[in-house]
């Protein structure tokens, strides 16, 4: 079965054709319509543009699998909110109904983007034979999912949600002074306010003001002055050992390390703890090292002292495809 797969994120909409036999075809992409890109456009208008965009790329009579970057109810597929796409607006949106209304000839299947990425990771050789797999995406937003490989289950709560860690409260300090940064959802002090791509840029502004001439002389500031995008500048500066960039990454990694610590403390069956998304992949092993540095300093009671490799050996930065995961989810639903 050939499936049209789409991945809707806060930055891009991507689409391709996929099948288990042929794999993923050529991927095309365009900019995501959002209230951040078009501040004068209402959320309803932005949603309508997005639905039209998605509907136009699917062939007649096709099956479509969608990886969607939003908190959504995995029982009903109702979309609750997407801070990167629609900011503070949290009115439920029946995306599946809107897509079916635009293209009733298509069989639509929608899952959350982190769920899709996790389904792809769970299908790989690396994840086979494991008990549970934990995956967090660190990108325009931050979220996490856990799958029990023995049953294939991704449990959800009373709202059909799991792992919306980006909107948990977090504590981050610079020079010993706690910061209270604003998340894209409108609330203060969330994990994503510090650890997402936009959050790291906000932290960068704090350091720019706090460090003054040290910031100006830093590799990070020099890269930015040459017109490099922030993510590229940060990655280059971290790789060069720039102290300001390393400090910035350490601050951004702390809320994620806090969540990993708690996750492993409560569930030792997590055999793989993985990170993906633009931020984590761009920084690669440097991102993992920043998280592990926090866990080395403040780890699991007794375990970190007596079995220090127990945490390190199960952690990785890995590239997975929400497009492939959307295809896997759609195929599974088609066959049931």
Predicted ranges, named:
Residues 2, 18, 26-28, 36-40, ...:
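Glycine/GP-enriched mid-protein hinge/lid loop-to-helix segment characteristic of carbohydrate kinases
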Residues 35-47, 63-64, 71-134, 164, ...:
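Glycine-rich phosphate-binding loop and adjoining helix at the ATP-binding site
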Residues 64-70, 138-140, 272-281:
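Glycine-rich beta-strand-to-loop/alpha-helix junction loops that act as flexible
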Residues 11-12, 116, 139-143:
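Conserved A3 ("GATE") glycine/threonine-rich loop of ANL adenylate-forming enzymes
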Residues 2-78:
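Conserved phosphate-binding loops in N-terminal lobes of ATP-dependent enzymes
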Residues 39-59, 187, 191-193, 199-202, ...:
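Adenine-nucleotide phosphate-binding core of ATP-dependent small-molecule kinases
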Residues 12, 263-298:
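Glycine-rich phosphate-binding loops at beta-strand->alpha-helix junctions
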Residues 9, 297-336:
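Conserved glycine-rich phosphate/nucleotide-binding loop
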